[in-house]
Amino acid sequence: MKEKIISEINLDLVFQCNDFSQFSNKLKDSKTKLIFESIFWEKVFLSWINTILKKEDYELPYYIFEKKSFSLGLQIISNQEIASLNKKWMQKNGPTDVLSFPIISDESLNNLDQIELGDIFISLEMALEQSYEYKHSIYREMIWLASHGFLHLLGWEHNNEHDLENMLNFQEYLITRLN
């Protein structure tokens, strides 16, 4: 892949995390505690944006390459809250691990200095269950879910096995590029 030189990227991250003190016994180590810090997620998303912007051969919406200022929201919520969102917006019963709500459209870009990508919601309870099921850390699972939600904000979909495989491979690529 060809690398491009890019200028400074700005990110406005709106981060919110519920009180999950009931899980404090499962979230003890210092690396895991990072998932509750806004500055951590800002660095993660900036890393991913920079990784994407340095390559010319990704099939992403053109506007991603035209702007250098982005905004997105990330909320870490409960199963109950994500189940409510899942029912209201996806017409699906029960909790899910991650939901993304992209809001960017070509029409909304004309006079904007900053691209509003949308919002990502992650269920901490589902992430804990899945980290146990897949035998990796909650830190790894949260990064995985955030990368999945982030790619949906950029227009990625997985309506078939081929698209899903490409998306999952790209998620892994982004995760391996984190410093």
Curated annotation (Swiss-Prot):
Q: Tell me, what is an example of a GO biological process annotation in this record?
A: rRNA processing
Quick check: keyword rRNA processing in the entry? yes
| Keyword annotations of the record | Cytoplasm, Endonuclease, Hydrolase, Metal-binding, Nuclease, Ribosome biogenesis, rRNA processing, Zinc
One GO MF term attached to the UniProt entry: zinc ion binding
Q: Which positions does UniProt annotate for Zn(2+) binding?
A: 148, 152, 158
Q: Which cofactor does it need?
A: Zn(2+)
UniProt key word Signal: no
Q: What is this protein called?
A: Endoribonuclease YbeY
Record function comment = Single strand-specific metallo-endoribonuclease involved in late-stage 70S ribosome quality control and in maturation of the 3' terminus of the 16S rRNA.
Q: Which PROSITE patterns match?
A: UPF0054
Family the UniProt entry places it in: Belongs to the endoribonuclease YbeY family.
Its localization reads:
Cytoplasm
Which NCBIfam families is this protein grouped with? rRNA maturation RNase YbeY (TIGR00043)
EC number(s) in its UniProt entry?
Answer: 3.1.-.-
Give the GO cellular component terms, alphabetically. Answer: cytoplasm
Q: Which residues form the signal peptide?
A: none
Report the co-factor binding details: Binds 1 zinc ion.
